[in-house]
Amino acid sequence: MIKNELNQKLQLTCIVCALLSGTNYLHANGKWSDRHEKGIIPTVKKLTEEGIHINGTVRDSQGEPLSGVNIVIKGQTIGTTTDIDGNYFLEVPSRSSVLVFTYIGFEEQEIVVGNQININLNMHEISTGLNEVVVVGYGSQKRASIVGSITTIEPQVLSQGTTRALSNNLAGNVAGVIAVQRSGEPGADGSNFWIRGISSFQGAGTSPLVLVDGIERTLDDLNPAEIESFSVLKDASASAVYGVRGANGVILVQTKRGKLGKPTVNVHFEQSFTQPTKLPQYIGSAEYLTLLNEIAKDNGQQQSPYSQETIDHYINRTDPDLYPDVNWMDLITKDFAMNQRADITVNGGSDILRYAVVGSYYGEQGIFERDKSQSWNSGTHLNKFNLRSNVDINITKTTQLTVSVGGYLQEMNKMAISSDDAFSGAFETPPFIHPAYYKEDDNIYFPVVNQRVNPYVQVTQKGYATTSQSKIESLFALEQDLKFITPGLKIKGIFSFDRYSWSGVTRSKTPDLYQPATQRDENGNLILNISSYGQQFLSTSENNDWGNKATYVELNLNYERTFGKHQVEGLFLYNQRDYQQFEESYDIVPYRRMGIAGRASYTYDNRYIAEFNFGYNGSENFAKGYRFGFFPSVAIGYLLSEEKFMEPYKDTFSKIKFRGSFGLTGNDQLDGRRFAYQTTLGEDGTGYDWGTNGQYYHRNSRFEGDFGIPNLTWETVSKTNAGFELGLWNMIDFQVDYFFEHRYNIFMKRNNIPTSAGFRNTPWANYGKVNNQGIDLALNVNKQINKDLYVGFRGSFTYAQNKIIEQDEALGVMGTNRQRTGEKVNQLFGLVDEGLFTFDDFQKDANGDYLIAENGGYVVNKDIPTHTFGPVRPGDIKYKDVNGDGVVSSLDETAIGGTYNPQIVYGFGTNFRYKNLDFNIFFQGNGMTYGFKGGCSNKFTPGETMGAMGNILTNYQDRWTVENPSQDVYYPRLTWGKARIMSETLHGGWKT
């Protein structure tokens, strides 16, 4: 399958950082004052003449000056930053003032002014990140106390990609995440991604839960500039608190919040371009017709379909209208398309109010061509605007109000047909049947062949479609410190309301279409005959509207306190969510969930850690008595590096940590089926006519639809995880995890119930079981060589393999080679090839001539199984009789290869920073992924319509022929018609 647009991109990035603030200057008279440039917001308060003037230099542990260090007077809004040489000047109100020094990647430090006037400081890098705060389920923890399998990634890494969809930046960047981008089409280019692979049957929910600021939202709605932290929860101890939503893992995203200090403004702009990484290369008309002659001869035709004179016309391009040679892929696509991204971030605040505002724009064009002579535009272009504002207000010293509002507006224009149809037309249309259009007397005429399309017409003449999307997200939270009851106790309430709307309009038309011209008249004009009349105007608009809204409520109680060497943490919360879809005036029954969750964690002497989590959740998707479930987890951890006997080796082993967990999580996404415990009724038009005397009334018939199963419940996953973390020399961080998951009660339709049971639709059941296991690892290296040079490396590797332990299969399949139990989820099935037929595989008569079968093929030897898919000849694929019945048929299909989804995903890259110049390079890839070259609908093999089914790849010469009867070729014998089936049946091993 060819992707519509692939994301090979070159990126030109311009980052402008401006610290907009009041700056203190020393006048000639010795007086200090504030000077503000025009348009710059003053934020440093004017001080009285009695203020104390402080200056100094801030350096790192190696004595190199640090530029951009934030220095704020504790409890006030007065502050400044160091210049490029690490120097600063600041006026403080009194000698009791406390200066707070903060800098990313360094430990925060506080210094009392006292009698000092010159305060110099050496800041120290944060060691191994043990004190770093990591976002976890319904809260945050220090990295040292985390015993679950959690991967975090810096927001800067996510912003290095140049596509609209944030999900495209996960593969290879985040250990444990397997992601596949199926399309590059603007607006539809997001990746499918899974945490630690797939462990449920296709159709059931396999996507992870994505929470933005604690609210269930869509990852690709975000702009990377909005993100402050990004965490992936992989094991049960990390995700059990989410109960029936945690089986597939959880992604937690926190958006940027305001920081104490003067406002900073960051402006970012980038220009990039998109081009297809690889498009199929096809042969031209002359080669095509020559090959068709060869195939005809091989099939016993005495006369070639195309004369050499005709082929010479194509070679010499004597008359391109009558003898065209069209590269349809080049005709309908551009070489590249431009993209732009721009964002602006404003961040700052005081002890009372802190704010972060992020606005962004993203524009992207598609690679399909348009007809610029049209008054309307069928070209693909997307414009997206994001805005997010997060405000934190300290109402009192113990009460904080949070108000967060965000959203986006996206407008898109594209051709009226789908991109899949556009590519399909280019794949299927040979280069010689007609040109894109005829131009006669300044008029344009579009040719087409029956049962085919004109790819150029499809892309440029069929009209256009526009879509508009908008979303508003809101969150309100109130947190109260309850230290008057006991220190470390807090209560927090959260309310969120989101609303999404989508609307689309399609304006379509069809031009007049003509039969391909075959000759010219005596005046040299093309003789054109109409094939079908179209319309010269765009059709009436077709409107579609869709949307949804979601409400979320949460109340949580948090406790965190340290008693000597003992550190305890606790969480208890209640939440509920209401989600409703609506289409035009039709409202769908809301989806509702509610539950409670809790966490208890104990750490002794920063070395030994134990944690218990649980979720008790309910879903309206099940019958009463089956709606709620309890999902517990336990985890332990041991920090060897914190032992006293390790202190002499601290410079080398900055972190050595062992951890393990076990627990249960659930999944209530049941293959799109709602209220499966209820029996449904269906209706059709095959009912009865009622009445007398010629007056009859028709009544539709009703029938039993899906049979209700009252004891259906959620899928349950037991997860086991063992992890090891190693830090070396305060610059290398290595993490590896082994995981094993057993998923049971998988929701599926029964397949072995006979039709005599009377079910119109087979009933559902919690029947399936799947095991999933693997490893994921991550390596990060960060080294500040000196004040000007920084070097970094990052890499990740994920391997996940699943196996179906139990699955309800049809009686005729169970116990045979077609059984899917024991195979991978979404395992590919097909015939097993045993090479190509040779001349020795067929019977001859007494005269030495090959025996001809009734279907036109040759008669195979008696020791070779009968092939039922069509006539066979030397050069065709020989298939294995897997079930041993002497016949090759669909009953011989068995597991071949693997799955379309990769089992291995990896990535690695390096980055250098010298002064203000950054250089980044990153590679990502996947392995153990399989697919068929073409299958039964192969578009690259000659066929029967107009002498051909589709285009032919340029590597066609690597094929079996009588002159080259090799087994080591890319293609088997090329043919057409019914015989073509034998060379296209799904199979494994033959050049896959």
Question: Can you describe what each PLM-predicted range is?
Answer:
Residues 102-106, 479, 782:
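Beta-strand-rich extracellular modules
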Residues 301-324, 398, 408, 413-473, ...:
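Acidic/polar loop-and-plug regions of large Gram-negative outer-membrane beta-barrel proteins
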Residues 62, 69, 92, 220, ...:
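Short linear motifs in exposed loops
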Residues 61-63, 481, 727, 784:
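Short solvent-exposed strand-capping/beta-turn motif centered on an Asx-Ser/Thr pair
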Residues 152, 160-163, 194, 198, ...:
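Outer/extracellular conduits and scaffolds centered on Gram-negative outer-membrane beta-barrels
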Residues 1-387, 401, 812, 873, ...:
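Short, small/polar-rich motifs associated with maturation and membrane association
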